[in-house]
């Protein structure tokens, strides 16, 4: 055998060899009828065989000799099945000896049968097609009528014809991928009846060849059983059944395959369309569902804590940017907030409940984002609510002196107004830094009266400005918090200033507070005094420590006003208590903690402020995460157990 194989001629490099053959059984004509009666009919099906592979078509019931199937299947050719024929044709020497062994594998056998309910299926005819001859005629698709013959050794009769299409392919999908069943031994009549009584679906025993479009499969056994059930009414079954296993191998992912598979294996009833829809086609359910849910945001609308409102949710810009710019970013506000998966819809604006005691001094309207604008509009009214009354009574006797001092400082700092970085250079020609001293504005009795109120308002007020710092600049927040909390004797920053200088500083400060220009430009580098918060200790020590910080804040505010070019007229204040301020300023020997910041430059103060702001921002983020968690937990409780949130009725009075 090795010598014979060695004598094989080499195949031409340009010769095309198929690996599969695709057979399509279209129809038949002139078949013999097997049923009794005048109009003889038959339940015909065809068995297709190449080598040892067998496949069967569906059963066409009660056909009058002209059934139509239009079903196809594919067979894999054995290796070297057509090589001998090709080499013999190329050599013009006839069939080669090595081609005889593969001759049986190159024959297509078509056997037409009649499906009988009881007994063996009846033979209708058989046709044998030589595939090598068909392939020798060319690679094109061949459609031809083949005559049906009798079995070998039997008398030849007129059995009709069958039309078949043969197509050779290469590297095509095999029909075995469809789990097509082979035509094994014929079953006994009793096994068929037993299967039908049990209602068994015989997918493994009927044809699984592919169906061309616009065709339906009919169960061969169920077809004859339906005819018999008309008389007896016992074996009545559905006659037609579509199966995805009988689809063509050329339509693996087609719509007909998917719909047929879902229709035959899934529930057939109301709502079956939703059950059998493929995931790719049912994706519109989720998208449209999300669209519907987005259009109805009133499912869960609730307000969060006092730090923000449902209709004023915002995303705050970086706080370093607030320090450098000093104004609000209008694009950072938003009227809609998505907290996790919850949509906060816009609701009617109402009073907000705050956890601080300062809500009595501020207007109780929608949000605290417009605090600066309200302070600008109300002017003297907000000043009356914020500052001590003793300071208002003493702010009218030093207007002329304050105006002169502001004019002198404006002349000195005029070059610094054009360039913010030259403020330090503008102070050097004077030989000493600009220090502002503010006189005492209340007696010791007023300090004793407001000591208790200051302790109560200290924590809530700082908490309020901690959460709602966006509407005010940093210098204004520090100044208001420190002055609003202390409200007592204020000591100057330097013991070397005279009483006239103190009166000038005080009159210019309160004159600016009462006249409040809304168009005033902020300083390019607002600096917040770090010692504005109250310090633990005795009352005298607290007052002495906070005096320098207040003086520093007022001096920076005055410099900001001078550089911005908006000097407001001031009112004259009386000089009552001026000598007491001078004595306290000279007698104070306690070192203020804010003195350690005097040697720092403007840039160093800004960097220190930015560091503190980063720490506060981290704390705010943590608080916001906790608030979001509480909101999600509340919504989850509302969804799962809303009865937990119901207030039980109180006892009858």
Swiss-Prot record:
Post-translation changes: Phosphorylated on serine and threonine residues. Phosphorylation at Ser-357 is PKA-dependent.
Show the SMART domains listed in the entry: C2
Sequence ranges assigned to domain FIP-RBD in this UniProt record: 586-648
Q: Name one GO biological process term.
A: insulin secretion involved in cellular response to glucose stimulus
The way this protein sits in the membrane is described as: Peripheral membrane protein
One annotated GO molecular function is: small GTPase binding
- List the biased-composition ranges (Polar residues): 277-286
Q: Where is the C2 domain?
A: 5-146
Q: Where does the chain cross the membrane? A: none
- Subcellular localization, per the record? Cytoplasm; Recycling endosome membrane; Early endosome membrane; Golgi apparatus membrane
Tissue-level expression: Detected at low levels in heart, brain, placenta, lung, liver, adipocytes, kidney, spleen, skeletal muscle and pancreas.
PROSITE patterns xref list = C2, FIP_RBD
Alphabetized, the UniProt keywords read: Cytoplasm, Cytoplasmic vesicle, Endosome, Golgi apparatus, Host-virus interaction, Membrane, Mitochondrion, Phosphoprotein, Protein transport, Transport
User: Where is the stretch described as Disordered?
Assistant: 269-300, 342-402, 415-548
Q: Which InterPro entries match?
A: C2_dom (IPR000008), C2_domain_sf (IPR035892), FIP-RBD_C_sf (IPR037245), FIP_classI (IPR037789), Rab-bd_FIP-RBD (IPR019018)
Task: Locate the compositionally biased regions of type Low complexity.
Answer: 357-368
| Additional free-text comment from the UniProt record | Antibodies against RIP11 are found in sera from patients with autoimmune diseases such as systemic lupus erythematosus (SLE) or Sjoegren syndrome (SS). It is also found in the sera from mothers of children with neonatal lupus erythematosus (NLE).
What function does the entry list?
Rab effector involved in protein trafficking from apical recycling endosomes to the apical plasma membrane. Involved in insulin granule exocytosis. May regulate V-ATPase intracellular transport in response to extracellular acidosis.
Domain notes from UniProt: Binds to vesicles enriched in neutral phospholipids via its C2 domain. The interaction is favored by Mg(2+) rather than Ca(2+).
User: What protein is this chain from?
Assistant: Rab11 family-interacting protein 5
Q: Which organism is it from?
A: Homo sapiens
